[in-house]
C-alpha cells in the first residue's frame, strides 16, 4: 500500500514538519527534552520513503539503547516502513562483524563478553593486586570496568593511559598505575580466551571497514541513508565507525541535545554534535523547541538552569499550567527518605498509580538507602540502573534454575505454580525487584490467551526474545533510578532526592570548591535531565546545604 505523504506530515508541529521535509542530508536537529524528536525523525524517514527520496531498505537508523531502538522500529512499522534497519550502534556493528568474520579474520568467531566481571576479577589476580583491590567490592569493580571502557572507546592504548588520564577533566577514582596493569591483563586474558567485548566490536568493525575495500563497498551499498539519535553522546570510536559507514557521502541526519551530555565518564563527547556544521558546512540545522512533556512551571525552572550554563535549546511548554516544583530541606538522609516515603504513601492512598511515580538520585548508594526503607514499609518498587537487567547475578541464577526445571515439563495448568516455586527463594533480601518482575511476566503470560505453549519452555522462549532485544520485564510499581539511568524516560510525578552540595554536584572529597568548571557543567546537565523527567509534579529534596543548582533554577533564593 502506498504511503500517504500528506497524512505523515499532518501529525507534526511546524518544527517537526521542518525536520520531515528535510529529506536530503546533511541535517542536524537540536532537540530539547520532550520535544518529540523520535516522532520527528521517524516521520522524516517515512515521508522521504513516501515521496521516493529514500529507499527504506537502505536506511540505517541508529540509537544507543535497545529500548530506544525498539521504540523506533515500532513507530516505523506504524508509519508503514517496517523494513528500515533501526538498531543500536553496537548491534549494527556486531551484525556486520560476525557476518564478515570468517572471510576477513578466519577461524571461529569469538565469544562476546556481555559482563566483564569474571574477566576483571581474573585481571586483578593476574596483575597481583588482590591485596589492594577487593573483587567483592562491586562499586570498585564497576569503576574499573568504566575506566577500561573509557580508554577503549577513546582509542587509548594501555601504554598511553596515564598520559591521557592526566589531560582528562574528570580523574579516575582508581590508581592510574594499577589501571594500566589491569587494562593490560584484561586485554591479554581476552586474547587468550578468544573473546571480545562490546568496545572491541566497535574497534574491529571500524578497522574492518577501513582496511577491507570489498567489505566497505558491500556495507556502503547496503546502507545509503543514516539517522543518528542521541548524537551528543557519541564517542570517538563510534564516530569513527559512522565515518566508515558514511564514506564520502552526506546523507546523514543527526539528532541531539547539548544540554543532555552526561556520559563523559564513558567517553561520550558533544564535540561531534557541536562541530557538525564545520564538517558539513551545507548542513541544514533545525531546532525543536516545543516541550510536550512538562508543565510550564517545570519548564521555566529547567530553562533557568539552561541559561546559567548556556547549555542548549530552551523550551516552550505546550501543556497547561500546573504546580510549581516543590523544594524541601531535611537535616539528614534518614529524615529525607522518611519525608519522601510519607509523600509517596499519601499519593498512593489518594489513588495515584505507582508506575506514575519515580524516585531519582545521583548515586546507586542513595537508591540502596531508599530500597531498604521501602522494603521496611512494604512499598513495591523496581530499580532501573545502567547495569543490563539480564546480566544481573540474581536474574541469571533464577533463569538457570528455570531452564533446569524445564527439562521435565510440567502440565500446562501447573507451570506458573512451578515458576512461583522456583522464584520463592530469590524473593528475600533487599534487591528482589528483578525476580519479582520476571514472576510478574509469567503471570501476564499465563493470563494471555494467545500465549503458547503454556509451559516453562514457552516462558523461556519469551524471556530469550527479551534478552535478544534487551527488553527487561517491568511491573506497575514505583521506579527507583539514578539520573543516568533515567535519561530518556518520563513519569507523572518525580522525586529528585539528594539535591545537596557534595552530592549534586558530586564530589569524592566532600568539598565542592575543588570541582572544575567542566565537572560542574556536567553535573548541572545531570540535574537538568532529572528535572525534565517530570511531566506534572516535581518534588526536590536536599539535606544539609542545598545544591547550587536549586538557586540557578530559581527554585530557591
Model-identified regions with their sequence ranges:
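P-loop NTPase Walker
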Residues: 1-106, 110-111, 217, 247, ...
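Conserved AAA+ ATPase "sensor/coupling" helix adjacent to the nucleotide-binding pocket
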Residues: 100-101, 122-127, 301-310
